[in-house]
Amino acid sequence: IGGVAAFDPEEGGVVSPGGVGFDINCGVRLLASHLTLEDLLPRQKELADALYRLVPSGVGSERRDVRFSKRELKEILKEGAGWLVKRGYGYPEDVRFIESEGRLPWANPDKVSERAFERGAPQIGTLGSGNHFLEVQYVDEVYDEEAALAFGLFKGQVTVLIHTGSRGLGHQV
């Protein structure tokens, strides 16, 4: 999966040669928290330390605290985000914000190579490397109140911008 996006230069456009990554579901998501900047500032070092400790990232990053068997990986590939939610790795209300609710009904994990399973198993729940990142931000200014309300955003709100994808498993597929 990859793509080039070109926009009309007469309209101030640009060419983006890598607007979409080549691992499945590579992309950027915005997590809107219930916290405000005032809530966060006194605890920012504590938050940064926790993120470094709890979110494995970088080349070769793996989860050591969570491991899935091949059978479980096949179930994840078939049932999608719902499988993870049922086991406490997410919130039911979040599934409705994922494309196709995080599941493709026609997915067939039997078509996935052994190499993809080997690469993917230790990487589930990791951020990755390269241009993947996790960035804690806050809403500094709201320019369109109606749009902000629709997205559940408000001035001073802490958000987390996450760029990740399916890593080795998705790359192999």
Q: PLM ranges: what are they?
A:
Residues 3, 7-10, 14-19, 24-149, ...:
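Glycine-rich, flexible loop motifs
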Residues 155-173:
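A conserved active-site cap/scaffold subdomain adjacent to cofactor or substrate pockets
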